[in-house]
Amino acid sequence: MHNLPLPPSAVRLRAISRRDALRYTTALAGLGAASAACGMPTAAAAAPPRLIDFAAQQIPAQQIRAAGYSGVVNYVSLSRPGSSFGAKPITRRYADSLTAAGLVIVSNYQYGKPGGSAPSDFTRGYAGGVADARTAWQLHTAAGGGQGAPIFFTVDEDINRDTWNRVALQWFRGINSVLGVQRTGVYGGIDVCQWAAADGVIGSSGTPGRRWAWQTRAWSGHRIYPAAVLYQRVVSTKSSPGPRVGGFEVDVNDVLAPDCGQWNLHQGHRTGDAR
């Protein structure tokens, strides 16, 4: 079996025990086809494992598993005023049911939305980043999220470099001041992912060469950022609905790295206290 990549917080260790090696193997097992990265040939190895993301309702774990998915990206944020999303935020009970079914969980934060009852989160500046990071961390830990796991913060629109530099970057620096860079991830188009990495406001995956970048196909021009850990291949819209799981339309994400920020791989690795 090939050596498994360690989370960055554990890189300082010169060696790992057999017990720790087993823990990493178990943590990765939920990704199904990602077992190929551990030298385990399977028929599914040709296709990447997939995670779904959704907001409308909590989809039963067994239905997610039966549909062939390896886990979820779930919200550690509240519903906007005037809306009531059943999957926002993820709860401890639901998270436990996903884990019991052998599914992995990745955290993301999105409260506001373009044209919604609350503005896009990234427009809230440094102070907004501080507040959003504190909310995200409280909801993440309340649901059992890994102490060293990243939270992916959302830029859900097409922005240019000037807007990134003047507005979004300040928001991310506010987030960093609370969580630290290593627990900060980004969701957005390819440009946003690349800018976040270049400006040093997102952390690194335990998979060499990968960053905490969850890229959507939107605003990406059919390009995929080589350092991304997740790629949102299917974006469910009214004109192009995604597949249904448990009666609800979902977005579908390819897992591009064995360490995509899943809770169970970062459960016991602290990277400093949130402020």
Task: Name each model-derived stretch.
Residues 23-27, 31, 44-71:
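N-terminal module-boundary/linker segments of secreted carbohydrate-active enzymes
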Residues 50, 56-59, 74-158:
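Substrate-binding cleft of extracellular glycoside hydrolase catalytic domains
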